[in-house]
Amino acid sequence: MASGILVNVKEEVTCPICLELLTQPLSLDCGHSFCQACLTANHKTSMPDEGERSCPVCRISYQHKNIQPNRHVANIVEKLREVKLSPEEGQKVDHCARHGEKLLLFCREDRKVICWLCERSQEHRGHHTFLTEEVAQEYQVKLQAALQMLRQKQQEAEELEADIREEKASWKTQIQYDKTNILADFEQLRHILDWVESNELQNLEKEEKDVLKRLMKSEIEMVQQTQSVRELISDLEHRLQGSVMELLQGVDGVIKRMKNVTLKNPETFPKNQRRVFRAADLKVMLKKLRELRDVQHYWVDVTVAPNNISYAVISEDMRQVSSPEPQIIYEAQGTISQTFVNFNYCTGIRGSQSITSGKHYWEVDVSKKSAWILGVCAGFQPDAMYNIEQNENYQPKYGYWVIGLEERVKCNAFQDGSFHTPSAPFIVPLSVNICPDRVGVFLDYEACTLSFFNITNHGFLIYKFSHCSFSQPVFPYLNPRKCTVPMTLCSPSS
């Protein structure tokens, strides 16, 4: 309908002489309007008498002095030139803007429609030119292929957009579900786990805010990406439905835009890599805490017993044990050197308490130490002490049930050596998520078990010796190794 109205308006502002839109329109007394150039040319050919002329359309006479520029019609023509009509009734686009000649040729190098004067210009000299009809089919095929590719990309873009929205909804649902469960579990354990609840909810809400913010940004990018492809498709569809001129006009830019279309995948977050604190974690933690509370009922006050064999440095209260500082030795030639005692066998020391029955628990502070060994021993055997240099005596069969740390991170248990190497202990690497600053030791003499707890990590069990052969009294055992930082026996009140 709009196209028909525009066509009618165009007819009203078309010059009856040149049949083109009026240029510098002049109106006569009869109401008809003509281009200034057309009316001037008509005057020269009509040769009027006594200054009277007649309208080329209705033949009504008019005076030359009565000719008036029609600014209203000129404005209508100007607006009409800016309006793009439908393909059936559209404006003529087949004339060269520079030369006014018909655009009948296509320049292969510049991918532009040109006229015969453009072909002879310096700009296109030496270029390969063809009739527009000759290349139209070729570009029809290219644009059709481009359209097909873009439709496929549109489908992919829409699928990516749908996926990101689905993932966004899934994330919101999952996090809401996790939040609800965490709230319910913490409500039951609020009296002992308030700080855990607060910490976990804060982390979860921070994760929700961060992930949803990034997913929202990714969703916006996907929507913009889809819209961009749609707009390019619309442009191509319009060209393919239009005339040859509309198909080829600016085709180079369209092809470049088409080639630059690259779909960006949205940012995703694998849920299986998340670590969500769950009720099971609370139950395990609570169980460990209860186990620790149970064994702490058997806490005994342990101190160390000085002896003439160990080189360990003992504090006045008999609770701290450390390795001696390096000794300075003056050699015969007057040179000075530093040397360490052999810490592997010289710094071990036992507790003063002799254990022959019952349940006993104590804790050892090993914070800031890079190496240590602790547990229980069946008593020192001076003849065997000198064989401990490579940890060879740290075996249950020799009366040592111990675990140790070395190089700050390697935690090991020492079991009996194998059949092939009976003199060397079998080293059991221990998986400790948090390096202990404080270790709890629980001895059940009748059950023949010795357990070690990581007080730093909610009392989780580090290692347990079972079926221990306690055939004689055993004693708490400490060895600070080469690390001069002290290890401290904690009092029950600590």
Curated annotation (Swiss-Prot):
Required for interaction with GABARAP and for autophagy: annotated span: 186-199
Q: Which domain of life is it from?
A: Eukaryota
Phosphoprotein recorded as keyword? yes
Zinc finger spans (RING-type) are 15-59
**Keywords assigned by UniProt, alphabetized:** Acetylation, Antiviral defense, Autophagy, Coiled coil, Cytoplasm, Immunity, Innate immunity, Metal-binding, Nucleus, Phosphoprotein, Transferase, Ubl conjugation, Ubl conjugation pathway, Zinc, Zinc-finger
- Per the UniProt entry, what is one GO biological process? activation of innate immune response
Q: Which residues carry this modification: N-acetylalanine?
A: A2
Q: In which pathway does it act?
A: Protein modification; protein ubiquitination
CDD domains reported for this sequence = Bbox2_TRIM5-like (cd19761), RING-HC_TRIM5-like_C-IV (cd16591), SPRY_PRY_TRIM5 (cd15822)
Q: What is its EC number?
A: 2.3.2.27
* Catalysis: reaction(s): S-ubiquitinyl-[E2 ubiquitin-conjugating enzyme]-L-cysteine + [acceptor protein]-L-lysine = [E2 ubiquitin-conjugating enzyme]-L-cysteine + N(6)-ubiquitinyl-[acceptor protein]-L-lysine
- Ranges in coiled-coil conformation: 132-241
Q: How does it assemble?
A: Can form homodimers and homotrimers. In addition to lower-order dimerization, also exhibits a higher-order multimerization and both low- and high-order multimerizations are essential for its restriction activity. Interacts with BTBD1 and BTBD2. Interacts with PSMC4, PSMC5, PSMD7 and HSPA8/HSC70. Interacts (via B30.2/SPRY domain) with HSPA1A/B. Interacts with PSMC2, MAP3K7/TAK1, TAB2 and TAB3. Interacts with SQSTM1. Interacts with TRIM6 and TRIM34. Interacts with ULK1 (phosphorylated form), GABARAP, GABARAPL1, GABARAPL2, MAP1LC3A, MAP1LC3C and BECN1.
Q: What does this protein do?
A: Capsid-specific restriction factor that prevents infection from non-host-adapted retroviruses. Blocks viral replication early in the life cycle, after viral entry but before reverse transcription. In addition to acting as a capsid-specific restriction factor, also acts as a pattern recognition receptor that activates innate immune signaling in response to the retroviral capsid lattice.
What's the protein here called?
A: Tripartite motif-containing protein 5
